[in-house]
Amino acid sequence: MSAQIIAIDAMGGDFGPRNIVQASIACLSATPSLHLTLVGQPSLLEDLVSGQSAADRARLQIVAASEVIGMDERPSQALRGKPDSSMRVALELVRDGKAQACVSAGNTGALMALSRLVLKTLPGIDRPAMVAAIPTQAGYCQLLDLGANVDCSAENLYQFAVMGSVAAQALGVHRPRVALLNIGTEDIKGNQQVKLAASLLQNARGLNYIGFVEGDGLYRGEADVVVCDGFVGNILLKSSEGLATMIGARIETLFRGGLLARAAGAMAMPLLRRLQADLAPARHNGASFLGLQGIVIKSHGSAGVQGLQSAIQRALIEIQENLPQRLHGRLEDLLP
């Protein structure tokens, strides 16, 4: 198998490079064909990778970057004021063919702005969209947009649907069911943009558009791809993650009660642990920026080692599936 090379913005995120380096090393150990390039302050990164096996160290490169983009920094500042940031250098490695994907836990707005500047969008795409896998009763659905585009036109939503369908196919869904997230399933429901997008999708060639889906239908697994603007999508994503965390905490509190509750908890806990693990946000961490001429994965800034590993694994899958090239080929057929 040919090598996969991923550039990691090692300085991004809420907790600095320690978790990022630990996740990188774990992914190297699990995937012999993987090569990683850590971008950041060399002295700091060299200390963190010291002591690794010779085999892992041979597949781990460090590239210097003298600047770091803050999590609360304006994207315009990142574009103009920090040409040697770890985020930008990692993206330039992808642009120059020295890496096949970039993973960052840094500032979302800055990452999107720099990705569009450095990598450019695919022909026919006005705006990239953030997409991630959401657990459902039937498995997973791809939800987009997750916050990159707060205000969207009907044409934007149409393009998101096309990109989401291709991404779902790359992840193994034969004929993805595509739906628009709405406040009802009837044709009369929704705002003007959603209604116009529905009209465009109903006439799309080669797209399995099934109509509107409500929030509860999303979790029942009624669609494989669910499309919405970034304002709605980000609220839905954060609410889902908060709900999953709250349910896990409430269950643990419940089973720490009296003797009977503890006995019931002892019997049920293995199954509940499996459920918690399946719904844990860390397991589904890693949102893809679809529509770029290169692979970019955004991790939660607060992600721990497991979550960062999930983001790197998503990048690996998209490399193996040649996702940007597949998108480019399908967009010519599906875009008006």
From Swiss-Prot:
* Gene3D superfamilies cross-referenced by the UniProt entry: Isopropylmalate Dehydrogenase
For the keyword Lipid biosynthesis, the answer is yes
InterPro entries, per this entry? FA_synthesis, Phospholipid_synth_PlsX-like
Its GO biological process annotations read: fatty acid biosynthetic process; phospholipid biosynthetic process
| Alphabetized GO MF terms | phosphate:acyl-[acyl carrier protein] acyltransferase activity
Which one Pfam family would you cite for this protein? FA_synthesis
**Annotated Gene Ontology cellular component terms:** cytoplasm
Primary subcellular site in the record, as a coarse category: cytoplasm
Task: Report if keyword Zinc-finger is assigned.
Answer: no
Going by the UniProt record, its keywords in alphabetical order are: Cytoplasm, Lipid biosynthesis, Lipid metabolism, Phospholipid biosynthesis, Phospholipid metabolism, Transferase
What reaction gets catalysed by this protein?
Answer: a fatty acyl-[ACP] + phosphate = an acyl phosphate + holo-[ACP]
Where is this gene product found? Cytoplasm
Q: What is its EC number?
A: 2.3.1.274
Pathway(s) where this gene product acts: Lipid metabolism; phospholipid metabolism
Task: Report the function annotation for this chain.
Answer: Catalyzes the reversible formation of acyl-phosphate (acyl-PO(4)) from acyl-[acyl-carrier-protein] (acyl-ACP). This enzyme utilizes acyl-ACP as fatty acyl donor, but not acyl-CoA.
In terms of HAMAP family, this protein maps to:
PlsX
Subunit annotation: Homodimer. Probably interacts with PlsY.
Q: Which family does it belong to?
A: Belongs to the PlsX family.
| Designated name of the protein | Phosphate acyltransferase
